[in-house]
């Protein structure tokens, strides 16, 4: 049976895992890393780089290197004004969705995420030795419907059938609770690169039930990095009188971001670090260098207001779950940012206990996704996951009021039907306006979709009976139906295009991604064939130089012609097939050369006339000269 992989598609890093022999296993990427930076770079030559190689060239190519794309998934421009200021690449609105620009071409957020997913998919295929077409992908628990749908679209573009979207804290609980026999109430505190989530769950006896979830999709490690960058810029301006925010300093800003992230990571274990950036900029007096010491205490002072933003969602989640901190048995930390000592202190103060450190915060979400994939594939038995919807789902009623249909933290899948009526006399159609959010008025919440139910028989207001049904599946994807009970007419909407991409656009992008994947393979094949031919040319030239005098002019000329042809091929832009053909031709010539050399060597080794033939006493005596006695060792016995 084909494997279903589990993917943690993160803001900063992504991880892929799979169930093997009943155990979840994290799969290393092509570079050997267990985590893959969620970075995509576009070079001038049209090459697309993903992961560590993309991250490495970000400093010299900041405007065409896309990172933290998860912050733009399923979002509109007015929702990401702060995020847009944090990145060096261009972000703009295009229709209903956001696009980023790289090398003059526009890409949607799901398209860029799909490039990261393709790399993880390939790593899994290389490891498993078979094609992979199905996956479970995780999202922050507080992702809304549009963000979830954008994630599913990214999977589809990457050639993956997304069998389930799982909340990240829930996935962490799956990994944590896999072997738990006793009942426990756990809190999963997930502070990632771009989002913050808190979930309260009950774990035990093969059942993992989410009681509540809360969070902030504008809060993450990126915000801490930005605080350090802002501090460095202000300090540099104070010292040198130069503003690194000025236009033309894009490369310097990228260097600052990289240095800020490194310093933040170092200060999780060290008390002080030095940020040293030579030649950060220059003025009329010459080059300028940035050298600054940053202590852990100063870092904590800089970011304290950001860290405090994680406390209120935790309190709300506990209130919604009907528990207080004393009832929480374990606090599981997720996300690399939770290695920061100050975050661990905040968690300890909030929940009154030391956080659990038995899981790897970078890998636990992908491991949980692999466990859920194992459940869907039938590899993991006796494990039931009961998740919740993170935000209230409502419809707009008279006066612009948001009337809740499914409250937040309702266990999913779920279905709810309510009866509504018309607001005016002789009204023949009603508009159903579907909303998501916690605000009392429709205009303050996010629109998921609108549709009209027409053909209602004219009647006084309040008489027609319109049944509205909200149905959420296990992925948190919503279907809404409105039905006139008198006529039986109904209208249905599946909130699936809320990522801003139509089905046709997703399919087009999937085809483009597939074509690009084929291009990538052709490029890899071409590089491999080029390297093989280049090596062969080098070796034959060396052999000809050392042994050219031992073969006839005709044989030598034939090889030199083949060498010239091979070099000419290498100078152009040949395909892998053309390179392989040149290599085969050169190999055939080299075989003839080798054969001629062996013959020449054999002839040179024949005994000259008048000397004793081999086997005669003198020859035997000569052969024995310089022989050293040694003990015989049977190598096999040593094995």
From Swiss-Prot:
MF annotations from Gene Ontology: ATP binding; ATP-dependent protein folding chaperone; unfolded protein binding
Region listing for Disordered, in residue ranges: 601-639
Skewed-composition ranges (Low complexity): 601-618
Pfam families per UniProt: HSP70
Acidic residues bias (residue ranges): 627-639
Keyword GTP-binding carried by entry: no
Entry's family note: Belongs to the heat shock protein 70 family.
Function: Acts as a chaperone.
Protein name in UniProt: Chaperone protein DnaK
UniProt lineage: Bacteria, Pseudomonadati, Acidobacteriota, Terriglobia, Terriglobales
